[in-house]
Amino acid sequence: HQFEKQEMIVVCKPEESKMWYEKLWKNTVDLFRSMDIPVRTLECCSGDLADLKVKSVDVEAWSPRQKKYFEVGSCSNLGDAQARRLKIRINGENGKYFAHTLNNTVVAPPRMLIAFLENNLQADGSVKIPEVLQPYMGGMKVIEKK
């Protein structure tokens, strides 16, 4: 099957790696929360980390239908492992050194759509439009059932 998603990739200095990791996963959390979708984060333990990953967090959205959270994104810090494989180096004051790389799945549209509809569906079948999206919907606050 085909799975589409939007990724954010960062190549940075090692000393910036922790800061970027925090920013990236918070971007995903903020995006979902701005659309009134409850989310939580789960930091992966070292035994569950895939190859190359130094640190990883999953972002999960609440599914009212399933009555549980499901994964909608993840963020990983790969340290310098991926940069070593790709030979990505930084010219620093003390010579060349390997960069750090980070990957963040910001959104997988099918999963976001599911979370959006489930969390904004009203009892009468209409869908509430979160305030952040209303300017893009011509000021519409609700999509009415026809």
PLM-predicted stretches and their roles:
Residues 1-146:
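TRNA-recognition modules of translation machinery and tRNA-sensing kinases, especially anticodon-binding
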